[in-house]
Amino acid sequence: MTRKTNDAIEVRNAVKRYGTFTALKQVSLTISDNEFFTLLGPSGCGKTTLLRMIAGFEDVTEGGIFLFGEEIEGLPPHKRPINTVFQNYALFPHMTVLDNVGFGLEMLGKSKSEARKRAGEVLEMVQLSQFSARKPSQLSGGQQQRVALARALAPRPKVLLLDEPLSALDLKLRKAMQIELKHLQKETGITFIFVTHDQEEALTMSDRVAVMSAGEVQQLGDAREIYERPRNMFVADFIGETNLLEVTVDQIDAGRAACHLGGGHRLTCDAVDGIGAGARVHMSLRPERLFLSSAPTESESLKARVRENIFIGTDISTILDLDDGPEFRVRASNSSRGTSRVFDPGTEVFVNMERGAARLLVD
């Protein structure tokens, strides 16, 4: 089946079973041409299985996978215009960097001179031209990763799959490579599909993110939407840090939901479709959207007591106990210019929130 489309990849009702275990359950999504798309989720959620199905390393039990409208199920990996960068870069230790990058091109029938010319072009693109004569063992981890990227980009694939390629790098290099990968994707115009369990990687690089759990896509959207408007409790808890409070919805009026939690505390937030008056649900409150004061600043300020302050570099995380209520966390910038003050343990304070900070969740 073929149909004209601008979608680089379409996954249509894809199911993957291993015996009696279902690894993917009716997954459907589309990935646009020239998009940086990330599959994000914990270990065992099905993200790598889906990536391997797109690459052709795993068969689809049910459903289909389409590349620019053409079904590719049954097409072997080497006949798909798709390349993969794995966690293990799998560079040939006896070959130079230039030969490693050009090897795949020669296997595709390019002459040695053509392969070397193209290899030189992509090495320049990833800023490794000066290392072309070196062996992989003479390179750092970050340089080896860029060689693997260059090798995957050399044949000009329509789609590049990246299976947690940054996981072996140290934090500082990983952050630098996140920016470099994003720039490289825009420069080449190739669709990137990136797999990771790291929320920061996903939010930093991606045009859109599919958050996965238990073989299903829990939410699909851009970074801001995923973070600020999580669809359910799993997404809110998995993406970043949040306070999850069990609340009862008392009433809904003019698009606002009035809720109460333990200890007589009351909070108001935007109403959410599917959650009506009387519902017992969870509310998400991001710590960085809360601030502390010595006196209430609004009618719904929550009285609490500081238990502990944790210094984490640029921020300070404060753990609080609400009066007759749950534990709370507030995150403040480690700067005198920040909105939230930092109080000593044992101090009675009030927790205040920015408008829009609270989000009701469909459990």
Where does each model-flagged region fall?
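Helix-to-loop junction immediately C-terminal to a conserved catalytic motif
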Residues: 55
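The feature captures the beta-strand-to-loop junction immediately N-terminal to the Walker
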Residues: 40-42
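Non-catalytic connector elements of ABC transporters
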Residues: 242, 252-363
